[in-house]
A protein has these predicted regions:
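H-loop (His-switch) and adjacent beta-strand-loop-beta switch element
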Residues: 226-239
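ABC family nucleotide-binding domain
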Residues: 14-229
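ABC-family P-loop ATPase nucleotide-binding domain
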Residues: 1-26, 236-246
Length: 246
């Protein structure tokens, strides 16, 4: 059984899910050093919905790669669900990604030869023994994103918005600690983008933790909170709307 599913029950609202402490990411170019992240300390808590914003060179992309366990910090601590991951090997980081992080990309990244149901199940292909509930959960997620009647459709038979819905369902198959969305509405028209943002709202209302990376202020303000970076540091934290009352 994926650890993400087992851990979901202990992601209580308000508890730390992602903890960054004095995180630095330094790139060396000859004799020069570029401090992409410069002493970042921040905590994302269960049930929160954040947008992460910043201009080119702010450290936004570097932070995205660290949060997604695609890269590791040069120094500092990065903990997911209490587990230190900053010093893990590539194979260990890959396992953490599969267990704790759900990705939604701008380009959907669906496999053309697979249908909707099969694409949703892709993250479980990497497990030696996919859980018995896998197909049932995939069907439920397809229903959840409004594609229960299109399980046999291939990506080229779906609109851009429908493909992104498949990508969101795929990202949720392991009950991740965080849903990490990178410019998730960037390839969509304004109407479809609003539909995807509405889906994020609904998932957040169900208790999902969402980190939405975007360069568009109107999209960023849609989240409850905004973390703005500049020169690898936190420049501003904005609370766009109050947390819903329990």
């Amino acid at each position: 059984m994926p650890a993400g599913a087992a851990d979901q029950a202990r992601d209580r609202a308000g508890e730390p899910v992602v903890e960054l402490t004095d995180v630095r990411r330094v790139y060396r170019m000859g004799q020069n050093e570029v401090r992409a992240l410069d002493g970042l300390t921040f905590t994302f808590r269960a049930g929160e919905y954040w947008s992460i914003m910043g201009s080119s060179g702010s450290g936004k992309s570097t932070l995205l790669n660290l949060l997604g366990c695609i890269d590791r910090p040069s120094s500092g601590s990065y903990r997911i669900r209490g587990q230190e991951v900053a010093d893990l090997s590539d194979d260990e980081l890959s396992e953490i990604r599969g267990q704790h992080i759900g990705f939604v990309f701008q380009s959907y990244n669906l496999i053309a030869q697979l249908n909707v149901l099969e694409n949703i199940l892709v993250p479980l292909f990497y497990w030696d023994e996919p859980p018995d509930y896998a197909e049932e959960r995939a069907r439920a997620l397809a229903d959840r994103v409004g594609l229960g009647g299109r399980l046999d459709h291939k990506p080229n038979e779906l609109s851009g918005g429908q493909q992104q819905r498949v990508a969101i369902a795929r990202a949720l198959i392991n009950d991740p600690a965080i849903l990490l969305a990178d410019e998730a509405t960037g390839n969509l028209d304004s109407k479809t983008a609003q539909e995807i943002l509405q889906l994020f709202d609904e998932l957040h209302a169900e208790g999902k933790t969402i980190l939405l990376v975007t360069h568009e202020p109107s999209i960023g303000r849609h989240a409850q909170h905004t973390l703005r970076l500049s020169d690898g540091r936190i420049a501003e934290v904005t609370h766009n709307r109050e947390e819903p009352k329990a």
